[in-house]
């Protein structure tokens, strides 16, 4: 009896529900809703059934015109039916003849607007490689797999998710060309959606280094007759009164012959040959030569004979920091840079710095943790005045100067071209949003200096900028500058497997949604990341990597995770020297493809490589 009663009650409820439906205004459900509520009894012999379903689908929908319900009957899955139905409706005009419909459903040709296309072409009509649909670089896409889940936005394949009248397209890897159509075969016809129109040689993005003979050793032995800068300015003669006055206190190599007004590299600038130009006193410019690329280990090796691990194991923290900049132009702070008031100056360690030292001996922040207060006193927040928002991270290198990434200030594909009046910097902060009274300092900017050879068009090469503060900032327990590395420090620490530290207020994970509140941290985040071998960095991306960059992060098989993410850009990648206990800024958070993805790494501007440029700008404009 109990069993019978148990069956009767649901029956009564069902009858009551049916009566309610009959008397309601909306009686019928949409086909997709109705079919999703129907429970079907599973049948045996799945292999046989697959053949039957395929035959049913072909009979119902290829040989004849079918409905959504008939397709569902054949596929027995709402998800599979939705995928099929999207292609089927896209092939509406191709239903006769049969072979044309079959080709359309296969997806290797375009029918109508080409929304059916599911092929693997990833080159545009002019020959530009497509940007990954999941990537934000070089373009921020408004269309992605979240906004258009049924559009099959895989990898960087051409698609038509917005039913463009010109057919399948993609975002491009050229920052100057946001999106472009692809040349797709038209179903059943001997033609394509748009004709191929290859760009003229020399236009667009360089996907590989120039093939011409390269200049070794950063042009220090260069004896050519080039006498014009990359910006087309003529060089001043080295014997001119202006050039002589500027050269008087410079540490020039006497072996480099300064002939006429030819570009030379007398100070061993890692950026290569340069010359003085007319204009403001101290104006200079770099000259355009194709330099031989050197691996990071070779370029920073500086002729050291020691094995890096042995060098670190065998030395103690007694080496004093040697000042590099002129305090008249640089300002104060270099003499005790990298020594944090709440840690090194009190002989205390923070919670995770031991991990860095152990990595030396043993050989955007995602998966990071909250930083301790005073842990990164050189951290700067680059803040937009209107609308008020966090733009990027940055680093305090003296009481007058701040270092950041150039793309935080200038990146036309994202409509970025900020001036000093658009921005301010907040120094000494821990909280992301709260104003920290008596702790943080807010400073206005006097001038922004972007590297003259910053390459936003191709690969963010030389992604570096200096910002001069209107007034010197006072140091405190929470505000203190970081050191910039010399050659020996770079040689010792920039080794694959050695860990550095990234800090920032960027997103905690990658997101496409407008509601980013849940992925933004409340306080400064910190993560320790290992430097990655240069060949692995190069193999992880299609973007051309230069020796002004290095990459860091965990490999898929290492069992750990971590990365910088959106909002961390411009912030520091620092390492602590076991020789003198000072913290050095080795890199600037530059770019990455997504956040914390397997097989992808964060790329950082190589600060040591660009230190001579930093010095030249500060010497010229510091007083």
Curated annotation (Swiss-Prot):
The record places propeptide residues at 25-43
User: Would you list which residues are glycosylated?
Assistant: 122, 144, 417
Q: State a single Gene Ontology molecular function.
A: serine-type endopeptidase activity
**Where is the Kringle domain positioned along the sequence?**
108-187, 213-292
Disulfide bonds, paired cysteine numbers:
61-66, 91-104, 109-187, 130-170, 158-182, 214-292, 235-275, 263-287, 337-483, 392-408, 537-551, 565-595
Gla domain boundaries: 44-90
EC numbers on record: 3.4.21.5
Q: Which residues carry this modification: 4-carboxyglutamate?
A: 50-51, 58, 60, 63-64, 69-70, 73, 76
Q: Where is the signal peptide?
A: 1-24
One BP annotation, GO: acute-phase response
Q: Which InterPro entries match?
A: GLA-like_dom_SF, GLA_domain, Kringle, Kringle-like, Kringle_CS, Kringle_sf, Peptidase_S1_PA, Peptidase_S1_PA_chymotrypsin
Q: What controls its activity?
A: Activity is promoted in the presence of negatively charged surfaces, such as polyphosphate and dextran sulfate. Inhibited by SERPINA5.
What does the entry report about post-translational modification of this chain? The gamma-carboxyglutamyl residues, which bind calcium ions, result from the carboxylation of glutamyl residues by a microsomal enzyme, the vitamin K-dependent carboxylase. The modified residues are necessary for the calcium-dependent interaction with a negatively charged phospholipid surface, which is essential for the conversion of prothrombin to thrombin.
Task: Please give the superkingdom of this protein's source.
Answer: Eukaryota
The segment(s) forming the Peptidase S1 domain are 365-619
The site (Cleavage) lies at: 199-200, 315-316, 364-365
Query: Whom does it interact with, and what assembly results?
Result: Heterodimer (named alpha-thrombin) of a light and a heavy chain; disulfide-linked. Forms a heterodimer with SERPINA5. In plasma, interacts (via N-terminus) with alpha-1-microglobulin; this interaction does not prevent the activation of prothrombin to thrombin.
The family annotation for this protein states: Belongs to the peptidase S1 family.
Q: What's this chain's function?
A: Thrombin, which cleaves bonds after Arg and Lys, converts fibrinogen to fibrin and activates factors V, VII, VIII, XIII, and, in complex with thrombomodulin, protein C. Functions in blood homeostasis, inflammation and wound healing. Activates coagulation factor XI (F11); activation is promoted by the contact with negatively charged surfaces. Triggers the production of pro-inflammatory cytokines, such as MCP-1/CCL2 and IL8/CXCL8, in endothelial cells.
Identify this protein by name: Prothrombin
The species this protein belongs to is Pongo abelii (Sumatran orangutan)
């Amino acid at each position: 009896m109990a069993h019978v009663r148990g069956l009767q009650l649901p029956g009564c409820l069902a009858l009551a529900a049916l009566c309610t439906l009959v008397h309601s205004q909306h009686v019928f459900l949409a086909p997709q809703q109705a079919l999703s509520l129907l429970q079907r009894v599973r049948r045996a012999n799945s292999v046989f059934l697959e053949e039957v379903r395929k035959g049913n689908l072909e009979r119902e929908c290829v040989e004849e015109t079918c409905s959504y319900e008939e397709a569902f009957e054949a596929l027995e899955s709402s998800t599979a039916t939705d995928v099929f139905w999207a292609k089927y409706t896209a092939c509406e005009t191709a239903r006769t003849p049969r072979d044309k419909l079959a080709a359309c459903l296969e997806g290797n040709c375009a029918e109508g607007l080409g929304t059916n296309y599911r092929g693997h072409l990833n080159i545009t009509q002019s020959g530009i490689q497509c940007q990954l649909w999941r990537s934000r670089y070089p373009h921020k896409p408004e269309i992605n797999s979240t906004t258009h889940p049924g559009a099959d936005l895989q990898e960087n394949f051409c698609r038509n998710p917005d039913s463009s009248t010109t057919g399948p397209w993609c975002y491009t890897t050229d920052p100057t060309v946001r999106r472009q159509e692809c040349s797709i075969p038209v179903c059943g016809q001997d033609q394509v959606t748009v004709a191929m129109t290859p760009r003229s040689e020399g236009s667009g993005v360089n996907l590989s280094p120039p093939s011409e003979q390269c200049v070794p050793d950063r042009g220090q032995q260069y004896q050519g007759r080039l006498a014009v800068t990359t910006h087309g300015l003529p060089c001043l003669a080295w014997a001119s009164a202006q050039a002589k006055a500027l050269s008087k206190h410079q540490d020039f190599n006497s072996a480099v012959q300064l002939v006429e007004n030819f570009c030379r590299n007398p100070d061993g600038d890692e950026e290569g040959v340069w010359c003085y130009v007319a204009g403001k006193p101290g104006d200079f410019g770099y000259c355009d030569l194709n330099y031989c690329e050197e691996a990071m280990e070779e370029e920073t090796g500086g002729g050291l004979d020691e094995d890096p691990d042995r060098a670190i194991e065998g030395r103690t923290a007694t080496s004093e920091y040697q000042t590099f900049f002129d305090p008249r132009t640089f300002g104060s702070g270099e003499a005790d840079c990298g020594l944090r008031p709440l840690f090194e100056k009190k002989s205390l360690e923070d919670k995770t710095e031991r991990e860095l030292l152990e990595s030396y001996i043993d050989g955007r922040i995602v998966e990071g943790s909250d930083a301790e207060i005073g842990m990164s006193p050189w951290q700067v927040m680059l803040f937009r005045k209107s609308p008020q928002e966090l733009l990027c991270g940055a680093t305090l290198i003296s009481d007058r100067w701040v270092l950041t990434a150039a793309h935080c200030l200038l990146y036309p594909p994202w409509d970025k071209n900020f001036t000093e009046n658009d921005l301010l910097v907040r120094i000494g902060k821990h909280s992301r949003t709260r104003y920290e009274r008596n702790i943080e300092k807010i400073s206005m900017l006097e001038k922004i200096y972007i590297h003259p050879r910053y390459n936003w068009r191709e690969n963010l090469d030389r992604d570096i900028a200096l910002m001069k503060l209107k007034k010197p900032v006072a140091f405190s327990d929470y505000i203190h500058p970081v050191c910039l590395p010399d050659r020996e420090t770079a040689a010792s620490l920039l080794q694959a497997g050695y860990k550095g530290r990234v800090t920032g207020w960027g997103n905690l994970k990658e997101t496409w949604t407008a509601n980013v509140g849940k992925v933004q941290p409340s306080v400064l985040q910190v993560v320790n990341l290992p430097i990655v071998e240069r060949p692995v960095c190069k193999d992880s991306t299609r973007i051309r990597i230069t020796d002004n960059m290095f990459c860091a992060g965990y490999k898929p098989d290492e069992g750990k995770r971590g990365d910088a993410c959106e909002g961390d850009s411009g912030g520091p990648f620092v390492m602590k020297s076991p020789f003198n206990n000072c913290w050095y800024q080795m890199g600037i958070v530059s770019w990455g493809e997504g956040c914390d993805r397997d097989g992808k790494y964060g790329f950082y501007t190589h600060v040591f490589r660009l230190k001579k440029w930093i010095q030249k700008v500060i010497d010229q404009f510091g007083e």
